[in-house]
Structure formats: C-alpha cells, structure tokens
C-alpha cells in the first residue's frame, strides 16, 4: 500500500497524544520529516483525511489533527506475525547488526531502537510492535543478530537474547506502573536500594524424549522449574505418544541474573509518593553487576501468580539497565521560560545570596554567615568533575541554639537532603553493607546501599555527630574520595558513588562551652576527621539582652504566622527579591538551576586566592606556627566556585574569592587562632598550637633530665616546678603542661608528688 508506513506512523503518533489530537506543524511534522520524505508525508496525510481516518481543522491559526479511527487495528487482531516481521525487517536488522559488530566488536549485544530508526526512518512501526509484543519481537531480533554474527565471524555467539535499549514513547513513572502494563515494554527511571550478587537460571530448556530421542526447546520463565515443566510436555515426534520429557542441563541455555530492589527517584518523588518494585536483570555473558545509583530500566512488567491462582505481585523483567545519574538535575533542565525569567531576575539582585539564605532559613534567627555557607553547600555536591567539589560543614555549639532547626528546614525544602542521627546510626548503615537474606529466588548475598550512597549528589545532615565514634572511620574516605568501596571476598566487589556534602552538628566535649577553656580544648573529634571539613563554626549561647529580646519576638512572630496560615489567613510577610515573590518551589528550582553551572576561575579571583594563601603561610612561618595547608586552599576554591554558582555566573570573580576567604578566615580564627603567637595555627585544631607545644616540650625535657639523674627514675614535682620557673615558665603553664602530658599518656604518677616517664 502506498505510503503505508507513513500512515501507520501518523496514526501511531496520534494514538499516543492526549485525546488522540495534535498540532500538525509542531507536534507531528518535525518528527515525520526526519523519518520520511516531506512530500510523501504530505501525501500520506491527505490520503488519511480523504479516507476519513483523520480530520483537520484550523484552531487559533494551528492545524489540529484528530484521529477518528485506526483502520489497521480493525483489519488485524493484536497478534504478532513473525513471518511478516522478518520478511520486512531482516535485511535492515542484519545491516544494522553487522555495522555495530564491526565497529563495537564481537562482545556487543545491544539493539538500540532509537538509533535503528534513525538509520531506517521508514521502520518506525518496529517500535510499536516491540512495545506490544516485547518477547516475540526480541526473539526475532535475536535470531537475526545470531545470523549476522555467524556471517561476520563464522561462529555462533553465546547469547540467549539481545539487550534492548532506547525504545520510543513508552516512558512511564515508576509510580504509574500497574497491571495495565503487564506484558508491554516500558521504560522508567529508578534509584537502586539493594541488589543481589549474580545468580544463575535456565532461560531456555532443552528436552528430549526418553522413548524416541526427539528433542524440544522451550523458553523458561523466572518461576518455571525446568524438571517439572518437562513432566507436562509431550513428545513432538509424529507417532510417539510419550508424555514427560527429560530436561538436559548441559544443553539448556543458562544466564546470569540479579534481583534488584528499586525505588522512585528523587526527581519524581518530590510531588508524589515513593514506590518500589523488584527487577530481574539478566546477562548473556559475565558482566559487572549493577549495585547502586540512579538507573534507566527498559523491561516488561510480569506477574507471579499465587498458589491459589490469584494475581500476585508485579515484577519487572529488565531487557536493559543503564546508569542515569542526572535525576533531580533534570528539573533544572526542564524549567519553562517563565521559571527561567524569574530565576534570572532574582540572580540580578546584588545581595541575592544573603536574601536567598534569609528566606531558605527563615525559621532560624541570626547566624547569617552560617546560613550563607549552608546555601553554598547545597549547590556544591553532585558534579561530574573528577575532583571533590562538595563542601563539608561542621557546627559545634551549645545546646538549643537552633542547629537542629536549621537542618530540619533544609529537609523540608530540598528533597536531595537527608538527615541521620549519629547516635542511632552505624558505619555500615551510612556506607552500605553486604548481608545474606531471603530474596525471591532463595537466600542470597545482598548489597544494601547506605545513606551516603542513597544521597549521592545531595547533602547528608548528621546530628549529634560526636556521640558515635564508630562512624568516624567510615566517613574519612567518603568525605575526601566521594565514593565507597565494598568488597566481600568472592561475593560482591563494588564501587558505589557517594558525591555528598556533609553538614554535621555536635555539642562541645563537656556538653556546653566552658569559658575557662579554649575552644580547641573542647572539640571531641579526631584531627584527621576535622581536617575533612571545609568550615567549622563555633556557636556559643551568650547572654545578650538585645539578642535575647529579638529571639523572643522572632519565636512569637513565627508561631503567630503558622497559626494564621493554618486558619487560611495571610501571614502578612512576603519575601521579594528584585520584584519576584519567593516561594519554596521557586527556591528549589533556583538552587537546582545553580547546581548545574560549572564556572571557571578568573585571573582576578586566582590572584586574590593565591595572595591570601601565600601571605598566611609566610606570616605563620615567621612566627614559627603552621598557618594553612593545601586543604584550606581547596576549601577556598570550592566555596568560591559555589558562590559564583549561586550568582548564576559562569565565571568565579573577585567577589566570590573574597567571600570564600572571609568564610574560611572567620572559621580559622574561631578555632585555630593562637593568641600567644598572634597568628593562625591549624595544628591547634584538635591538636596543640606551637606556643603550647614549646612549653609542653620544655616540661617534658625537664622531667626526663630529673628522671635520668635519679636511681628510682622519679621526678619530684617540686623540682620540676623549680627548674621550669628558671626556664621562664609560670606555675600555671607548668601545671597545664603536666596535665596535658598525663592526659596523652607520656607521664604518670606512681605516688603522690612524683612523676615518671611511660616506658
């Protein structure tokens, strides 16, 4: 039939449109012109109108095409005709496969639907047949693949099926999956929650007759028991009435497969409930299993019948799974023109970052610098640059200053933020673990993703950070390397992505800051872990009449505002930036849009950063302290880049570098400023500043000298003080040094008034 393929394509496209109606020039014609000759497309449309299959009317200057009937559906029942399919597609498929095998190599076993139709535009009908008859079409395509392989390499490939990727117009959300999709090809995005190691199953059963030797090959389903299936089979040979065939394990086709538990990804769960399902993914050849991250799945929903014959749970038989790490960033890529206009207007405000942080953390009063820093953190994680960009922040504070409220505010507004309590968490719970548990097909080793992997590309808030030392070792590598390596010998070997920013909060060593001790003496965390944080903020609850009055007013106003909203009244307070009224949805879109920007560092920013780094190190050298290292330099760069991103700038400018330095410098002065030397000394962070190290070393040497001069090896305390005083130390400095040496285990007191070196 003339123009038959084009007419089928037009009808198929209209059937997938809402109300089977579309704008000809904008919705249909561009795609059709890419597939067929434009003149033929026009003629095919005219024929369909004259046949009464479609109608055309002009609405607001647009050609609106409506499908009236589908003649092809009336002419043929929904049955797959393999002979007709192969007659039409064999040559095209074989040409495609030979090209791919020649360019990609003999290991290649994937059929890309979209790519195939681009090469053969007249073959759009293949996609529809694949969606309606996925198993039959895949089997036919696999047979053609085997023929092409044999003709090319003069040997038979060891494949049971071809993988199918990039089908057209069958994308659904996991939350939309229902029994209506049973047996049809679908494509959806998901996040992996857990996955088993590779297991083996028989995908194709080879059977023979025990009486005459006739053979039969049969495709086996996931729940089919090969030997039980054989008992119900009859001999295929004419004249043989034998019932019950023998299953031959050696000649039957085996495939590796995984059971994978998946969940609705973040992007789709922002405005809808999360859904989960189990996916069975098969491999022709030994391949790297899929254990974590965001994936795109092409497969067929299948149902396991219950023993009583009722319909059971819905599963997915995956034809292909591929990594798809964009997820929530897709929201930014799909913003409409109005969203982009509002976002760009907001970005033009000179104080955009301060105003955005005021709105984002409006539940918390004060702490402007901390709120700005956390906003920078939100846009720092999840990039594909091959170096750490995530900003890690630690807040050490007196109880009740609002750090938990700040974390809760983040979780409510940004779906890529997760929160855990260190005291109730475990190391494996954070990074992932390999456990043995019951799966659909027997017990199996299962890799369960941890919180840090599930939050890949986002932010993880860890409250009560200092109350569980077990998690420290697990966090060290993740915070720097942004990945998790899991190895269970002989079972599972995987590298999981964990490009997360950590926002941690804890109280000081004794619960509340002691004014008689320096800040660094009250931080109860190991130095190697503290080194991983870009910013460490110290928050003290000081009595201040004006500040306390402001907090009281803020709390009451906040309560009244919530009550008014509950009653359906206006809270009376609006946040407007450059004429744009801000709301939580627009804030999320702004942050997501900013996250995808990858700015370059300008020469002016480079000069500012370099001068600060060099000058601080030079000043420290002159005073005999250890100023800053390459770690702090990395922090400044990450913060400057994030600051530029929040301004929606493609270039890191002077203002970005200056704000980054201001943040780092403020934090260092809070925790690493040594008043005796008058300079920053990063050894002070969870360690000892040089001024104190020198005094401790003097006292330790005095104890050594006295101990070595006595037969009993003891150093009388009175003599220690006398010698130290002659060396220029005060009584308080000697007392502090002795207490420090005792605490770190360098000395001990075997009896009152005497000190001895630890051997």
UniProtKB/Swiss-Prot annotation:
This is Uncharacterized MCM-type protein MJ0363. The keyword rRNA-binding does not apply. Belongs to the MCM family. GO terms for molecular function: ATP binding; ATP hydrolysis activity; single-stranded DNA binding. SUPFAM superfamilies: Nucleic acid-binding proteins, P-loop containing nucleoside triphosphate hydrolases. One of its GO terms (cellular component) is MCM complex. GO terms for biological process: DNA replication. The keyword Nuclease does not apply. It holds the Pfam family MCM_WH_arc. Keywords: ATP-binding, Cell cycle, DNA replication, DNA-binding, Nucleotide-binding, Transcription, Transcription regulation. Residues 352-556 form the MCM domain.
